[in-house]
From Swiss-Prot:
It comes from Bos taurus. It is a multi-pass membrane protein. Glycans are attached at residue 206. Interacts with PEX19. Pfam families: Tim17. This is Peroxisomal membrane protein 4. Signal peptide: none annotated.
Amino acid sequence: MVAPPQLRALLFAINALLSKRRYHAALAMLKGFRNGAVYGAKIRAPHALVMTFLFRSGSLREKLRAILQATYTHSWNLARFVFLYKGLCALQSHVQGKTYQAHSFVSAFIGGLLVFGNNNNINSQISMYLLSRVLFALCRLGVEKGFIPEPRLDPFPWFSGLVWGLVLWLFEYHRPTLQPSLQSSMTYLYEDSNVWHDLSDFFIYNKSQPSK
């Protein structure tokens, strides 16, 4: 099917605009917004689907609404953050005439305050997800730069043992300090497995099904 001349002219004009170097920073912000929205939806929707149907009570409509709300919030926040981060980086580079490493930190710091500063479940999950990876990366950077002696043996087994020891101790004795979705997951694993009445809720279901 051949596109009408008006559509071909429009596409030609858009592609010509996209190829102009002078608009690259602004266009990169727009594409960053697009990619943030898509990526946020792709990673949040499956997670929200599983967590909602595993742990949330309520009608099907309420569950679907919760899934859509969580997906929208994650997607919208990530899109705004990428847009703001790229814009602030471009602005600093333009003002100072070149790019410095500090630009990334300053831009992301401001974006984090403005976009992810609201203390809710989704922002909390995202920040904690990043925290674990930041700590790992900083340890590796410390070894790379010589600030931390390179270990002779792989420290990962000790790290894993420490993490699991701490999280189960917190769950058993200081549960309110843990993030709600982690509490739900650990309750399913370590508390619900202590209770059963017959084969149905021992093997087939987690909890007894209400009689109709």
